[in-house]
């Protein structure tokens, strides 16, 4: 019985070599698990930037797998494509062609949780991001016909690699947009808190009638370079009023140049043209008190 499914990364023997990669396990009750006999199902890769250039024939390093998924992934069931989709960190090559430069957002899918397609690279840090920023991993969940990503933004230039959470959105789970770069969805707490250094999200928020609960893990220091073994960790909870992933907050005085005259204590929103020919109702999620 494969009612419960688990995806994890581990080292496994494949012919003559031992490789890291994607492994799976199944359970009938969620308590007793059995590892799937074939592993790894997808080979991963490891190393340091400046090592092998992909497909260099002078090197014999079978563990160098270009554009492979790495060791932090989250899996969901994609109701649109009717497949299991696994999102996570994926190695991207540097400007000089060397491997193991940074991590971007990768994806692979499977119909049976065993046979996984070649991973695709979906989204990467770009010229609008600081130089030392990359994605630690990118958990995705499907809600209200939209794909949301709780992207873990890793900044290696601060405190051994701190992580804050950026909200990403997609209409198809493949093409991703990052419209909220200037405001983190979940930010680290103060330096004396368990989540003052890094926040780790997942793909399973708890949806209730009036709120959405996001449980997360936290480190008091950076996630990749902290050598202080006195740092603490824990589990935190962030609560969002239901469906308020983003919003507008009024100001007491609006005096921008597009107005004929300043508006005092009046909330006004101007939207782009929207075609409403086939719609009967519009729902506004707002507090007008």
Predicted features, each with a name:
Residues 1-289:
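Carbohydrate-active catalytic/glycan-binding domains of CAZyme proteins
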